[in-house]
C-alpha cells in the first residue's frame, strides 16, 4: 500500500501510516460493529484490553491528534505528513529544547515514533482478541510444544505469562517456534501482551546470552519483526 511499512518513515503520515490515527479508527469501528464497545474504556471493561492498554491507547491517540491539529494549522491546509519543513517549528511549539547533539526535530519524531509503536501494539492485541471472540474455536485443546509454549488452535501461547521475565531467551524461541510450526498463525494476544510487558526489562545482550543454542541461525525468523512493534 501507499503507506506500507512507513512507521519509521522520516516524513510519516500521522493519519495513514502504520500506527496512525486510521488504525485506531478502524479497530474501534470493528469493535463497535461487533458489539463490544466504541471507546477504549468500554473495551477495557469488556476485557478485550487491559485498563493500562486503554490508558495508553487514549494517550497515544491524544498525541497524534494534537500533532495533526497543529500540523494543519501550521501548514494552512489539511496536511497529515510530518514534513521536514514543519518538524522544527512543531517541536518549538511543543516547548521542546534542544539537547546537543539531538535537535528538537529529532525529539519530536521520537515522540511520534513512540506513539505509533504504542498504537501498533494495542491494535495488534485488540485485533487478535476480537478475532478470538468473534470466531471462537470449538473446544480447542492445548497441545504442548515444550515446558514454555503450547499450541492453542492456530495460536502460539506461552504456558506461563511470566515466562519472558523468567527466561528472556523465550522471546527469540517463540519466533523460532513460529518458523518451525507453519500451522501456527501467530503469537496469541495473551502471549504478545506478556512479551511486550517484559521487553523493557530485558537487555538485548542478556537475551542473546540466555539462549543455549544459536536460534537465530535457524530459519529466516521473519517472526522477529513483531518484536519491534
Regions found by a protein language model. Give the residues of each.
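Non-catalytic interface/linker regions that flank or bridge core catalytic/transmembrane domains
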Residues: 1-229
Amino acid at each position: 500500500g501507499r503507506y506500507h511499512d512507513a512507521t519509521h518513515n522520516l516524513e510519516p503520515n500521522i493519519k495513514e501510516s502504520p500506527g496512525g490515527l486510521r488504525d485506531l479508527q478502524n479497530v474501534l469501528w470493528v469493535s463497535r460493529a461487533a458489539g463490544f464497545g466504541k471507546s477504549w474504556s468500554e473495551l477495557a471493561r469488556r476485557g478485550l484490553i487491559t485498563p493500562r492498554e486503554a490508558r495508553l491507547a487514549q494517550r497515544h491517540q491524544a498525541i497524534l491528534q494534537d500533532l495533526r491539529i497543529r500540523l494543519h494549522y501550521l501548514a494552512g491546509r489539511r496536511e497529515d505528513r510530518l514534513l521536514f519543513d514543519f518538524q522544527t517549528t512543531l517541536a518549538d511549539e511543543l516547548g521542546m529544547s534542544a539537547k546537543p547533539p539531538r535537535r528538537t526535530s529529532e525529539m519530536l519524531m521520537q515522540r511520534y515514533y513512540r506513539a505509533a509503536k504504542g498504537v501498533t501494539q494495542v491494535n495488534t492485541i485488540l485485533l487478535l482478541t476480537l478475532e478470538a471472540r468473534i470466531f471462537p474455536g470449538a473446544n480447542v485443546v492445548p497441545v504442548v510444544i515444550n515446558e514454555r509454549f503450547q499450541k492453542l488452535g492456530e495460536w502460539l501461547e506461552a504456558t506461563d505469562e511470566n515466562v519472558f521475565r523468567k527466561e528472556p531467551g523465550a522471546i527469540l524461541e517463540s519466533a523460532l517456534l513460529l518458523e518451525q510450526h507453519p500451522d501456527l498463525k501467530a503469537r496469541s494476544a495473551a502471549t504478545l501482551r506478556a512479551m511486550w510487558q517484559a521487553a523493557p526489562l530485558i537487555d538485548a545482550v542478556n537475551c542473546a546470552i540466555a539462549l543455549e543454542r544459536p536460534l537465530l541461525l535457524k530459519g529466516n525468523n521473519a517472526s522477529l519483526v513483531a518484536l519491534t512493534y
